[in-house]
């Protein structure tokens, strides 16, 4: 009998709402809308709305939290101190695991929407050279260099995904794409899980094809 549905992380399609004959509006309490069968909603003249921009600052912050963890080898150095290996060292500077700074690195952003733009601004403040690839092919942003997909993969030291899940982005990061990245590349996915072929990413990490990866999203959650 509902006229309006308010939900998140629930599939909305003919199977789930086929008997909801009074439904006029579906409200998603998130930014992503890949859980909606929009063609079916259009056929039934059911409107939908999302909350664009609600998580921009949080996701941008989490992007850098993951990057710092990987870039500065924080797990290794945290364990090194907690296991009391530092107190027994003969030198005060221990650099068994090398790390580097963001300044001067090329940061490639896949999907320069609200979140991608915020990440770009912060990366620029750290001194990174920011480039981006438009997954829709229509997004042009002042202040940053737009490039093609292959160039972004080949030249970026850090690659972060902030794109929605669409037919253009599903399985975008596969074995072929990963093979074009630098061996030193750090890859971050903060878009949607199915943008990445997880088996291909695992292979790339295990073989040393890329240096590291941070995943905020997975194909199946919880994994």
Positions of predicted regions on the chain:
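Glycine-rich Rossmann-fold phosphate-binding loop(s) that bind the pyrophosphate
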Residues: 112-113
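An N-terminal-biased, well-structured beta-alpha scaffold segment characteristic
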Residues: 1-49, 154, 174
